[in-house]
Amino acid sequence: MGPVRHILNERKSRKIAAFLLINTAYMFVEFTSGFMSDSLGLISDACHMLFDCAALAIGLYASYIARLPANGLYNYGRGRFEVLSGYVNAVFLVLVGALIVLESFERILEPREISTSSLLTVSIGGLVVNVIGLVFFHEEHHHAHGEAHSCNGGLQSSENHNKSRNRHHIDHNMEGIFLHVLADTMGSVGVVISTLLIKYKGWLIADPICSVFISIMIVSSVLPLLRNSAEILLQRVPRSLEKDIKEALDDVMKIKGVIGVHNFHVWNLTNTDIVGTFHLHITTEADKSSIREKASDIFHEAGIQDLTIQIECVKR
């Protein structure tokens, strides 16, 4: 299936594409008005919209790439493209937020005259666009869950997911988009407030203060994405499974005939796919098939979808 057909056939992709077009069009309006009126608040809000557009485009592309089948070069598929893109996007957002804060402090020390003739109209228009985005993605944020997909392992790959505990995974792609739009909405509210204060009170300092507020919204909304994507790329044990994995290891050690567990590795392949491998040392007289099945059931219940177990008989 080509990318265009994928967008047309998938409800979530259609929503992303539609809002991407709306957001991109109004971003240019905000940039133009911001530079003409010399409003840092409006320019910073437009910068955030620029990265929102990048996030939307990445999410749209990732939703297509993630569907491509695994091949000889990408044995696990390309699901990690979304994770890598999210990390890069998060780093740039933090940098933009820091630059806006620095510029804001300069303007607090040396306030500049700002033209408010068209600023209020543009600010309210930006708020309307972001409210449309919230309506678009609120349902997905509230209800969407990712489906866990298993990958074929090496020595023994367990694929019976019906035995696993009923776990739901948030669709991190849609969640991230919703949080971006929510932060943008709060930023638009700040721009409208600062414009009103400048127009009717003459408080020029309201513009840089609003910009600092927007920057805080940008950074605070992106830090969880930055941390989570970095942990996935560094193959950290999933935070949500730490306790369950420890209990699973204890349960496996209680199986009759098991001597020890070695070379144990668990990591997030993508936001939803969890992979585990380990060597299981058992006694020579133990039943390999029975022990493998019991160990597989235990780790499936702990949330590991793709499990590879190597059985090693050890003389005692």
From Swiss-Prot:
Pfam families: Cation_efflux (PF01545). GO terms for cellular component: Golgi apparatus; vacuolar membrane. Residues 147-166 are annotated as: Disordered. NCBIfam families: CDF. InterPro entries: Cation_efflux, Cation_efflux_CTD_sf, Cation_efflux_TMD_sf, Msc2-like. The keyword Transmembrane helix applies. It is a multi-pass membrane protein. GO terms for molecular function: metal ion transmembrane transporter activity; zinc ion transmembrane transporter activity. Residues 37-45, 102-116, 198-202 are vacuolar. Keywords: Ion transport, Membrane, Transmembrane, Transmembrane helix, Transport, Vacuole. Belongs to the cation diffusion facilitator (CDF) transporter (TC 2.A.4) family. SLC30A subfamily. Gene3D superfamilies: Cation efflux protein transmembrane domain. GO terms for biological process: intracellular zinc ion homeostasis; metal ion transport. This is Metal tolerance protein 8. It is found in: Vacuole membrane. Involved in sequestration of excess metal in the cytoplasm into vacuoles to maintain metal homeostasis. SUPFAM superfamilies: Cation efflux protein cytoplasmic domain-like (SSF160240), Cation efflux protein transmembrane domain-like (SSF161111). The chain crosses the membrane at residues 16-36, 46-66, 81-101, 117-137, 177-197, 203-223. Residues 1-15, 67-80, 138-176, 224-316 are cytoplasmic.
